[in-house]
Amino acid sequence: MTVKKRAKALTGTVAGVMLFSVLAGCGGNSGSKAEPSGSSGNAAEKQVKLRMIESLTSPDRTTYLKEMLARFESQNPNIKVELISPPFDQADNKIKTMLAAKQDLDVLEVRDLTVAEFVNNGYIEPLGEYVASWSEYNTITDVSKSVGSLDDKLYFIPNGMYQRQLFYRADWFKDAGLNPPTNYEELVESAIKLTDPNKNRYGFSFRGGSGANAVPDAIIQNYNFDNIDHEDPNFLNDGKTMFSTPEAKQALELYVKLFKEGSPKDSINWGFSEQVQAFTSGVTAMLLQDPDTIPSLKEKMDISTVGTAPMPKGPSGKSFVFAGGAGWGVTSYSPNKDAAFKLIQFLSGAEENTAFAKATGLVPIHTSASEDPFFQDAMYKSLLEMGGKPDEYVNLKANTKYPGTGKWGQVAMETGQAMLLGSASIDDTLKKWDEYWAKERENYNAK
Protein backbone atom coordinates (compact mmCIF):
# COMPACT_ATOMS: atom_id res chain seq x y z
CA MET A 1 0.00 0.00 0.00
CA THR A 2 0.95 3.11 -0.73
CA VAL A 3 0.88 5.16 0.91
CA LYS A 4 4.40 9.40 0.44
CA LYS A 5 7.11 10.76 1.86
CA ARG A 6 9.96 12.68 3.33
CA ALA A 7 11.77 13.20 6.60
CA LYS A 8 15.11 13.75 8.24
CA ALA A 9 16.72 10.93 10.09
CA LEU A 10 17.23 11.09 13.79
CA THR A 11 19.89 8.91 15.32
CA GLY A 12 19.82 6.57 18.25
CA THR A 13 16.19 5.77 18.89
CA VAL A 14 13.93 3.58 16.84
CA ALA A 15 11.49 6.29 16.14
CA GLY A 16 14.21 8.66 15.23
CA VAL A 17 16.18 6.36 13.05
CA MET A 18 13.58 3.83 12.27
CA LEU A 19 11.65 3.88 9.23
CA PHE A 20 12.59 6.78 7.16
CA SER A 21 12.73 8.72 10.38
CA VAL A 22 9.00 8.62 10.53
CA LEU A 23 9.19 9.28 14.19
CA ALA A 24 11.54 12.17 13.58
CA GLY A 25 11.03 15.67 14.80
CA CYS A 26 7.84 17.53 15.45
CA GLY A 27 7.01 20.83 13.85
CA GLY A 28 4.98 23.76 15.00
CA ASN A 29 1.30 24.14 14.30
CA SER A 30 0.15 25.04 10.85
CA GLY A 31 -3.19 26.53 10.00
CA SER A 32 -5.23 29.14 11.81
CA LYS A 33 -5.14 29.98 15.48
CA ALA A 34 -8.85 29.38 15.90
CA GLU A 35 -10.20 27.13 18.62
CA PRO A 36 -10.45 23.57 17.35
CA SER A 37 -14.01 22.85 16.33
CA GLY A 38 -13.60 19.38 17.74
CA SER A 39 -13.78 20.76 21.26
CA SER A 40 -16.85 22.90 20.75
CA GLY A 41 -19.85 22.54 22.96
CA ASN A 42 -22.22 21.49 20.19
CA ALA A 43 -20.77 17.99 19.96
CA ALA A 44 -21.20 17.53 23.71
CA GLU A 45 -24.79 18.79 23.89
CA LYS A 46 -26.64 16.76 21.29
CA GLN A 47 -26.94 13.14 20.27
CA VAL A 48 -24.90 12.52 17.16
CA LYS A 49 -24.48 9.50 14.92
CA LEU A 50 -21.30 9.45 12.87
CA ARG A 51 -20.79 7.29 9.80
CA MET A 52 -17.18 6.29 9.27
CA ILE A 53 -15.52 4.24 6.51
CA GLU A 54 -12.11 2.59 6.39
CA SER A 55 -10.03 1.91 3.29
CA LEU A 56 -7.16 -0.40 4.28
CA THR A 57 -9.51 -3.05 5.61
CA SER A 58 -8.48 -6.35 7.12
CA PRO A 59 -10.32 -8.53 9.66
CA ASP A 60 -7.86 -8.02 12.52
CA ARG A 61 -7.52 -4.30 11.86
CA THR A 62 -11.30 -3.84 11.76
CA THR A 63 -11.69 -5.73 15.02
CA TYR A 64 -9.16 -3.50 16.76
CA LEU A 65 -10.65 -0.36 15.26
CA LYS A 66 -14.05 -1.34 16.64
CA GLU A 67 -12.47 -1.68 20.09
CA MET A 68 -11.11 1.86 19.76
CA LEU A 69 -14.53 3.14 18.72
CA ALA A 70 -16.12 1.42 21.72
CA ARG A 71 -13.69 3.25 24.00
CA PHE A 72 -14.54 6.52 22.29
CA GLU A 73 -18.27 5.93 22.69
CA SER A 74 -17.87 5.09 26.37
CA GLN A 75 -16.14 8.44 26.89
CA ASN A 76 -18.63 10.28 24.67
CA PRO A 77 -22.04 8.70 25.31
CA ASN A 78 -23.77 11.28 23.12
CA ILE A 79 -21.85 10.15 20.01
CA LYS A 80 -22.43 6.82 18.27
CA VAL A 81 -20.23 5.62 15.43
CA GLU A 82 -21.25 3.34 12.59
CA LEU A 83 -18.17 1.79 10.97
CA ILE A 84 -18.30 0.73 7.33
CA SER A 85 -15.62 -1.82 6.40
CA PRO A 86 -15.66 -2.74 2.70
CA PRO A 87 -13.32 -5.49 1.47
CA PHE A 88 -9.85 -4.05 0.89
CA ASP A 89 -9.86 -4.43 -2.90
CA GLN A 90 -13.24 -2.66 -3.15
CA ALA A 91 -12.86 -0.06 -0.43
CA ASP A 92 -11.51 2.91 -2.37
CA ASN A 93 -14.12 2.54 -5.11
CA LYS A 94 -16.81 2.30 -2.44
CA ILE A 95 -15.52 5.48 -0.80
CA LYS A 96 -15.40 7.35 -4.12
CA THR A 97 -18.95 6.26 -4.96
CA MET A 98 -20.27 7.44 -1.60
CA LEU A 99 -18.47 10.77 -1.88
CA ALA A 100 -19.64 11.42 -5.44
CA ALA A 101 -23.25 10.74 -4.41
CA LYS A 102 -22.83 12.68 -1.15
CA GLN A 103 -24.09 9.68 0.78
CA ASP A 104 -24.13 10.06 4.56
CA LEU A 105 -20.50 9.97 5.64
CA ASP A 106 -18.63 11.97 8.26
CA VAL A 107 -15.20 10.39 8.78
CA LEU A 108 -13.29 8.61 6.05
CA GLU A 109 -9.91 7.00 5.62
CA VAL A 110 -7.94 9.09 3.14
CA ARG A 111 -4.81 7.67 1.53
CA ASP A 112 -1.79 9.47 0.18
CA LEU A 113 -2.87 7.92 -3.13
CA THR A 114 -6.38 9.41 -3.01
CA VAL A 115 -5.96 12.76 -1.26
CA ALA A 116 -5.35 14.78 -4.45
CA GLU A 117 -8.43 13.35 -6.13
CA PHE A 118 -10.58 14.00 -3.06
CA VAL A 119 -9.32 17.57 -2.69
CA ASN A 120 -9.69 18.25 -6.41
CA ASN A 121 -13.33 17.15 -6.22
CA GLY A 122 -14.03 19.09 -3.03
CA TYR A 123 -14.85 15.97 -1.04
CA ILE A 124 -12.81 16.58 2.13
CA GLU A 125 -12.42 19.36 4.67
CA PRO A 126 -9.10 21.09 5.49
CA LEU A 127 -8.21 20.39 9.12
CA GLY A 128 -5.96 23.37 9.90
CA GLU A 129 -8.60 25.13 11.98
CA TYR A 130 -9.35 21.97 13.92
CA VAL A 131 -5.78 21.08 14.89
CA ALA A 132 -4.62 24.63 15.72
CA SER A 133 -5.35 24.35 19.43
CA TRP A 134 -5.08 20.58 19.83
CA SER A 135 -2.09 20.16 22.14
CA GLU A 136 -1.12 16.66 20.96
CA TYR A 137 -0.75 17.90 17.40
CA ASN A 138 2.60 19.33 18.51
CA THR A 139 4.02 15.82 18.99
CA ILE A 140 2.94 14.49 15.60
CA THR A 141 6.01 14.02 13.42
CA ASP A 142 6.72 16.36 10.55
CA VAL A 143 6.69 13.52 8.05
CA SER A 144 3.23 12.45 9.24
CA LYS A 145 1.95 15.99 8.81
CA SER A 146 3.53 16.13 5.38
CA VAL A 147 1.88 12.90 4.24
CA GLY A 148 -1.51 14.18 5.40
CA SER A 149 -1.12 17.49 3.56
CA LEU A 150 -1.55 18.77 0.04
CA ASP A 151 -0.40 22.21 -1.07
CA ASP A 152 0.50 23.03 2.55
CA LYS A 153 -3.00 22.27 3.84
CA LEU A 154 -3.68 19.37 6.21
CA TYR A 155 -6.49 17.09 5.03
CA PHE A 156 -6.03 13.95 7.09
CA ILE A 157 -4.16 12.77 10.15
CA PRO A 158 -2.29 9.54 9.40
CA ASN A 159 -3.14 6.57 11.60
CA GLY A 160 0.34 5.14 11.07
CA MET A 161 3.25 5.27 8.68
CA TYR A 162 4.44 2.77 6.10
CA GLN A 163 7.85 2.04 4.61
CA ARG A 164 8.87 -1.05 2.73
CA GLN A 165 11.67 -3.43 3.53
CA LEU A 166 12.64 -6.89 2.33
CA PHE A 167 11.42 -9.89 4.32
CA TYR A 168 13.18 -13.13 3.38
CA ARG A 169 13.33 -16.76 4.43
CA ALA A 170 16.63 -16.81 6.29
CA ASP A 171 16.64 -20.62 6.41
CA TRP A 172 16.19 -20.95 2.64
CA PHE A 173 18.97 -18.46 1.99
CA LYS A 174 21.29 -20.26 4.40
CA ASP A 175 20.60 -23.66 2.85
CA ALA A 176 21.29 -22.24 -0.62
CA GLY A 177 24.46 -20.46 0.50
CA LEU A 178 23.03 -17.07 -0.42
CA ASN A 179 23.27 -13.69 1.26
CA PRO A 180 20.24 -11.40 1.28
CA PRO A 181 20.23 -9.23 -1.87
CA THR A 182 21.51 -5.68 -1.68
CA ASN A 183 20.34 -4.53 -5.12
CA TYR A 184 17.65 -5.39 -7.64
CA GLU A 185 19.91 -7.52 -9.83
CA GLU A 186 20.86 -9.66 -6.83
CA LEU A 187 17.19 -9.89 -5.83
CA VAL A 188 16.27 -11.31 -9.24
CA GLU A 189 19.26 -13.68 -9.26
CA SER A 190 18.37 -14.96 -5.77
CA ALA A 191 14.71 -15.37 -6.73
CA ILE A 192 15.66 -17.52 -9.72
CA LYS A 193 18.08 -19.67 -7.70
CA LEU A 194 15.47 -20.29 -5.00
CA THR A 195 12.72 -21.22 -7.47
CA ASP A 196 11.82 -24.90 -7.80
CA PRO A 197 8.31 -25.36 -9.23
CA ASN A 198 8.46 -29.12 -8.55
CA LYS A 199 8.61 -28.31 -4.83
CA ASN A 200 6.11 -25.43 -5.17
CA ARG A 201 8.88 -23.08 -4.10
CA TYR A 202 9.46 -19.71 -5.70
CA GLY A 203 11.88 -16.92 -5.05
CA PHE A 204 9.60 -13.90 -4.94
CA SER A 205 6.11 -12.95 -3.78
CA PHE A 206 5.13 -11.11 -6.94
CA ARG A 207 2.14 -8.77 -7.00
CA GLY A 208 0.55 -8.41 -10.41
CA GLY A 209 -2.95 -7.49 -9.24
CA SER A 210 -4.09 -4.54 -7.16
CA GLY A 211 -1.10 -2.42 -6.15
CA ALA A 212 1.10 -3.93 -8.86
CA ASN A 213 2.77 -0.62 -9.73
CA ALA A 214 4.83 -0.41 -6.52
CA VAL A 215 7.73 -2.63 -7.60
CA PRO A 216 8.16 -1.48 -11.22
CA ASP A 217 7.84 2.15 -10.13
CA ALA A 218 10.56 1.62 -7.51
CA ILE A 219 12.95 -0.19 -9.86
CA ILE A 220 12.53 2.44 -12.57
CA GLN A 221 13.08 5.28 -10.10
CA ASN A 222 16.22 3.64 -8.77
CA TYR A 223 17.58 2.97 -12.24
CA ASN A 224 17.11 6.70 -12.94
CA PHE A 225 18.41 7.62 -9.48
CA ASP A 226 20.73 10.51 -10.37
CA ASN A 227 18.20 12.24 -12.61
CA ILE A 228 14.98 11.95 -10.59
CA ASP A 229 13.27 15.21 -9.63
CA HIS A 230 12.96 14.87 -5.86
CA GLU A 231 9.99 17.24 -5.80
CA ASP A 232 8.13 15.34 -8.51
CA PRO A 233 9.58 11.83 -8.53
CA ASN A 234 7.81 10.33 -11.52
CA PHE A 235 9.72 12.91 -13.53
CA LEU A 236 13.34 13.72 -14.29
CA ASN A 237 15.14 16.98 -13.70
CA ASP A 238 14.78 17.79 -17.41
CA GLY A 239 10.98 17.55 -17.20
CA LYS A 240 10.57 14.22 -18.98
CA THR A 241 8.90 11.29 -17.25
CA MET A 242 11.07 8.59 -15.71
CA PHE A 243 9.47 6.10 -18.11
CA SER A 244 11.09 7.75 -21.15
CA THR A 245 14.69 6.63 -20.60
CA PRO A 246 16.86 3.67 -21.64
CA GLU A 247 17.32 3.01 -17.92
CA ALA A 248 13.57 2.54 -17.56
CA LYS A 249 13.69 -0.19 -20.19
CA GLN A 250 16.56 -1.93 -18.39
CA ALA A 251 14.58 -1.79 -15.16
CA LEU A 252 11.42 -3.16 -16.72
CA GLU A 253 13.34 -5.98 -18.42
CA LEU A 254 14.58 -6.99 -14.97
CA TYR A 255 11.03 -6.80 -13.60
CA VAL A 256 9.70 -9.08 -16.34
CA LYS A 257 12.53 -11.54 -15.69
CA LEU A 258 11.62 -11.55 -11.98
CA PHE A 259 8.08 -12.59 -12.83
CA LYS A 260 8.88 -15.14 -15.51
CA GLU A 261 11.77 -16.91 -13.80
CA GLY A 262 11.38 -16.31 -10.07
CA SER A 263 7.67 -16.02 -9.25
CA PRO A 264 4.53 -18.18 -9.31
CA LYS A 265 2.63 -17.79 -12.59
CA ASP A 266 -0.68 -17.10 -10.85
CA SER A 267 0.94 -14.20 -8.98
CA ILE A 268 0.10 -12.08 -12.01
CA ASN A 269 -3.28 -11.64 -10.30
CA TRP A 270 -2.09 -11.44 -6.70
CA GLY A 271 -2.82 -8.50 -4.47
CA PHE A 272 -1.60 -7.75 -0.96
CA SER A 273 -3.28 -10.67 0.80
CA GLU A 274 -2.15 -13.28 -1.71
CA GLN A 275 1.48 -12.21 -1.77
CA VAL A 276 1.69 -12.18 2.02
CA GLN A 277 -0.06 -15.55 2.28
CA ALA A 278 2.39 -17.06 -0.20
CA PHE A 279 5.26 -15.96 2.00
CA THR A 280 3.74 -17.06 5.30
CA SER A 281 2.71 -20.45 3.88
CA GLY A 282 6.20 -21.29 2.65
CA VAL A 283 5.62 -20.86 -1.09
CA THR A 284 7.90 -17.85 -1.63
CA ALA A 285 11.29 -16.80 -0.29
CA MET A 286 11.11 -13.00 -0.50
CA LEU A 287 8.50 -10.34 0.13
CA LEU A 288 8.79 -6.58 -0.30
CA GLN A 289 6.24 -5.09 2.06
CA ASP A 290 5.38 -2.56 4.74
CA PRO A 291 5.63 -3.21 8.49
CA ASP A 292 1.90 -3.88 8.73
CA THR A 293 2.72 -7.42 7.59
CA ILE A 294 4.77 -8.07 10.74
CA PRO A 295 1.85 -9.16 12.97
CA SER A 296 0.81 -11.72 10.35
CA LEU A 297 4.36 -13.06 10.04
CA LYS A 298 4.65 -13.43 13.80
CA GLU A 299 1.31 -15.19 14.01
CA LYS A 300 1.73 -17.63 11.14
CA MET A 301 5.47 -18.34 10.94
CA ASP A 302 8.40 -19.45 13.03
CA ILE A 303 9.81 -15.95 13.22
CA SER A 304 13.35 -17.31 13.60
CA THR A 305 13.15 -18.32 9.93
CA VAL A 306 12.44 -14.75 8.81
CA GLY A 307 15.11 -12.16 8.12
CA THR A 308 14.80 -8.54 7.09
CA ALA A 309 16.99 -6.46 4.79
CA PRO A 310 16.94 -2.87 3.54
CA MET A 311 15.29 -2.01 0.25
CA PRO A 312 17.36 -3.05 -2.79
CA LYS A 313 19.55 -0.44 -4.43
CA GLY A 314 19.87 0.54 -8.05
CA PRO A 315 23.05 0.85 -10.15
CA SER A 316 23.99 4.05 -8.29
CA GLY A 317 24.56 2.09 -5.08
CA LYS A 318 21.75 4.03 -3.43
CA SER A 319 18.04 3.50 -2.94
CA PHE A 320 15.03 5.74 -2.71
CA VAL A 321 12.77 5.04 0.27
CA PHE A 322 9.26 6.29 0.75
CA ALA A 323 7.19 7.11 3.80
CA GLY A 324 3.51 6.75 3.13
CA GLY A 325 0.32 6.62 5.07
CA ALA A 326 -3.43 6.73 5.30
CA GLY A 327 -5.53 8.33 7.97
CA TRP A 328 -8.67 10.03 9.09
CA GLY A 329 -10.33 12.98 7.39
CA VAL A 330 -13.71 14.73 7.47
CA THR A 331 -16.07 14.95 4.52
CA SER A 332 -16.71 18.48 3.30
CA TYR A 333 -20.47 17.99 3.44
CA SER A 334 -20.71 16.34 6.87
CA PRO A 335 -23.31 18.01 9.13
CA ASN A 336 -21.33 16.72 12.14
CA LYS A 337 -17.85 18.11 11.55
CA ASP A 338 -17.22 19.02 15.20
CA ALA A 339 -18.08 15.53 16.43
CA ALA A 340 -16.21 14.00 13.50
CA PHE A 341 -13.01 15.76 14.44
CA LYS A 342 -13.54 14.87 18.08
CA LEU A 343 -13.43 11.23 16.98
CA ILE A 344 -10.32 11.81 14.86
CA GLN A 345 -8.65 13.60 17.77
CA PHE A 346 -9.34 10.58 19.98
CA LEU A 347 -8.09 8.03 17.44
CA SER A 348 -5.01 10.13 16.69
CA GLY A 349 -3.93 10.86 20.26
CA ALA A 350 -0.59 9.43 21.33
CA GLU A 351 -2.01 6.66 23.53
CA GLU A 352 -4.57 5.33 21.07
CA ASN A 353 -2.40 5.78 18.00
CA THR A 354 0.60 4.00 19.50
CA ALA A 355 -1.61 1.10 20.55
CA PHE A 356 -3.13 0.99 17.06
CA ALA A 357 0.34 0.99 15.50
CA LYS A 358 1.40 -1.95 17.66
CA ALA A 359 -1.74 -3.89 16.77
CA THR A 360 -1.41 -3.27 13.04
CA GLY A 361 2.36 -3.21 12.56
CA LEU A 362 2.60 0.45 11.61
CA VAL A 363 4.92 3.16 12.86
CA PRO A 364 3.24 5.56 15.32
CA ILE A 365 2.81 9.18 14.31
CA HIS A 366 3.87 10.71 17.64
CA THR A 367 7.46 11.42 18.64
CA SER A 368 6.57 10.34 22.17
CA ALA A 369 6.52 6.72 20.92
CA SER A 370 10.16 6.85 19.93
CA GLU A 371 11.57 5.05 22.97
CA ASP A 372 8.92 2.34 23.16
CA PRO A 373 10.70 -1.06 23.54
CA PHE A 374 8.13 -2.62 21.22
CA PHE A 375 9.79 -1.02 18.22
CA GLN A 376 13.23 -2.39 19.10
CA ASP A 377 12.05 -5.74 17.70
CA ALA A 378 14.33 -7.44 15.15
CA MET A 379 11.59 -7.16 12.53
CA TYR A 380 12.16 -3.40 12.52
CA LYS A 381 15.96 -3.69 12.30
CA SER A 382 16.25 -2.91 8.59
CA LEU A 383 13.91 0.04 8.86
CA LEU A 384 16.16 1.36 11.58
CA GLU A 385 19.21 0.76 9.39
CA MET A 386 17.74 2.65 6.44
CA GLY A 387 16.80 5.57 8.64
CA GLY A 388 20.33 5.69 10.01
CA LYS A 389 21.89 6.02 6.53
CA PRO A 390 20.00 8.91 4.91
CA ASP A 391 22.68 9.48 2.26
CA GLU A 392 22.49 5.86 1.17
CA TYR A 393 18.74 5.37 1.56
CA VAL A 394 17.37 8.65 0.31
CA ASN A 395 13.96 9.74 1.49
CA LEU A 396 11.66 10.68 -1.35
CA LYS A 397 8.16 12.08 -1.15
CA ALA A 398 6.01 10.65 -3.89
CA ASN A 399 3.88 13.23 -5.61
CA THR A 400 0.28 13.07 -4.53
CA LYS A 401 -0.70 16.35 -6.16
CA TYR A 402 -1.92 14.81 -9.41
CA PRO A 403 -5.57 13.70 -9.45
CA GLY A 404 -4.51 10.76 -11.62
CA THR A 405 -2.34 9.34 -8.83
CA GLY A 406 -5.33 7.41 -7.51
CA LYS A 407 -6.02 5.85 -10.91
CA TRP A 408 -2.40 5.00 -11.67
CA GLY A 409 -2.49 1.67 -9.85
CA GLN A 410 -5.32 0.40 -12.05
CA VAL A 411 -3.70 1.69 -15.24
CA ALA A 412 -0.32 0.19 -14.35
CA MET A 413 -1.89 -3.12 -13.33
CA GLU A 414 -3.84 -3.59 -16.57
CA THR A 415 -1.04 -2.52 -18.90
CA GLY A 416 1.55 -4.36 -16.81
CA GLN A 417 -0.40 -7.62 -16.95
CA ALA A 418 -0.62 -7.32 -20.73
CA MET A 419 3.15 -6.90 -20.85
CA LEU A 420 3.83 -9.85 -18.53
CA LEU A 421 1.53 -12.08 -20.59
CA GLY A 422 3.34 -11.12 -23.78
CA SER A 423 0.46 -9.30 -25.46
CA ALA A 424 2.28 -5.96 -25.20
CA SER A 425 5.98 -5.16 -25.51
CA ILE A 426 8.11 -3.45 -22.89
CA ASP A 427 8.56 -0.50 -25.26
CA ASP A 428 4.82 -0.12 -25.83
CA THR A 429 4.12 -0.38 -22.10
CA LEU A 430 6.67 2.28 -21.24
CA LYS A 431 5.22 4.52 -23.94
CA LYS A 432 1.75 4.22 -22.36
CA TRP A 433 3.14 5.00 -18.91
CA ASP A 434 5.13 7.93 -20.25
CA GLU A 435 2.05 9.36 -21.97
CA TYR A 436 -0.08 8.90 -18.86
CA TRP A 437 2.19 10.94 -16.62
CA ALA A 438 3.06 13.53 -19.24
CA LYS A 439 -0.68 14.17 -19.64
CA GLU A 440 -1.14 14.37 -15.86
CA ARG A 441 1.51 17.06 -15.60
CA GLU A 442 0.12 18.93 -18.61
CA ASN A 443 -3.37 18.98 -17.09
CA TYR A 444 -2.04 19.99 -13.69
CA ASN A 445 0.00 22.88 -15.11
CA ALA A 446 -2.99 24.05 -17.14
CA LYS A 447 -5.12 24.61 -14.03
Predicted regions and their residues:
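Conserved N-terminal structural module of periplasmic/extracytoplasmic solute-binding proteins
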Residues: 2-4, 8-16, 20-123, 132-135, ...
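Extracytoplasmic/periplasmic substrate-binding proteins
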Residues: 55, 115, 215, 253-339
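Periplasmic-binding protein-like
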Residues: 64, 345-367
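Long, aromatic- and glycine/proline-rich binding clefts that accommodate carbohydrate-like moieties
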Residues: 77, 306-310, 358-410, 417-418, ...
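Hinge/lid segment of periplasmic solute-binding proteins
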Residues: 87, 112-165, 179, 188, ...
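Hydrophobic residues within well-ordered alpha-helices
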Residues: 95, 187, 194, 217, ...
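Short, solvent-exposed loop/beta-turn-alpha elements that line the ligand-binding surface or hinge
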Residues: 128-140, 208, 225-250, 298-301, ...
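Glycine-centered hinge/linker elements that transmit conformational signals in sensory
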Residues: 191-193, 237-268
